């Protein structure tokens, strides 16, 4: 496996994304096959695992947590995302974050992303009622997030706008 240095940690160039996982005939995630895939990836040097709140009808984080539980926490890097891009009447970053920690069976996330910054979601991250960015900056200070970043499918003006506001708080971007 080829590794790249990111702020002093060695990340595998190949990451294991969990937006789509194998499913059984009844539509449920095939946890046994997923475990086999995770084991194979780790045995071959993959150490970066990426999940998110909405993946696999909100079950990806739970399955990923169960699959990684048997490995020492320091042997892998786990990334998940806050679903600010999803339409909601209210956004409670603390509630969602605590659920994510529980679902993933970890005490911290190595990488935490504000999910899918784009033209229709940037307002959610700006809205002072939710305090989303400030909440996650505080979690980083508390050591519950090691690296804070964002993912995006936005056009350049939207990305520029977001970075003008929050770029000093972000360490990475996943496009």
Per-range role (PLM):
Residues 1-76, 135, 141:
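N-terminal binding-site loop/beta-alpha segment at the start of enzyme catalytic domains
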Residues 1-10, 83-94:
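Generic structural signal for short, solvent-exposed loop/turn connectors between secondary structure elements
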Residues 3, 11-15, 47-48, 75-81, ...:
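Structural preference for beta-strand elements that scaffold enzyme active sites
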Residues 22, 53-55, 82-87, 118-119:
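Short histidine/acidic/glycine/proline-rich micro-motifs that form metal-
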Residues 25, 87-175:
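Glycine/proline-rich, positively charged
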Residues 31-36, 66-69, 84, 129, ...:
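Solvent-exposed, non-transmembrane amphipathic alpha-helical segments
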Residues 37, 79-82, 117, 121-122:
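Contiguous hydrophobic segments
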């Amino acid at each position: 496996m080829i590794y790249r240095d990111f702020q002093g940690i060695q990340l595998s160039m190949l990451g294991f994304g969990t937006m789509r996982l194998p499913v059984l005939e009844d539509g449920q995630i095939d946890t046994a096959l997923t475990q086999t895939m995770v084991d194979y990836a780790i045995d071959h040097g993959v150490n970066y695992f990426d999940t998110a709140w909405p993946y696999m009808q909100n079950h990806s984080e739970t399955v990923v947590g169960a699959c990684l539980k048997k490995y020492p926490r320091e042997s892998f890097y786990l990334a998940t995302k806050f679903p600010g891009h999803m339409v909601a009447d209210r956004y409670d970053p603390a509630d969602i974050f605590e659920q994510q920690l529980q679902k993933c069976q970890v005490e911290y996330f190595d990488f935490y992303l504000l999910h899918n910054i784009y033209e229709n979601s940037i307002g959610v991250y700006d809205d002072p009622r939710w305090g989303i960015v400030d909440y996650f900056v505080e979690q980083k200070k508390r050591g519950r997030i090691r690296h804070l970043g964002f993912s995006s499918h936005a056009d350049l003006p939207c990305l520029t706008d977001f970075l003008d506001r929050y770029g000093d708080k972000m360490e990475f971007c996943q496009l």
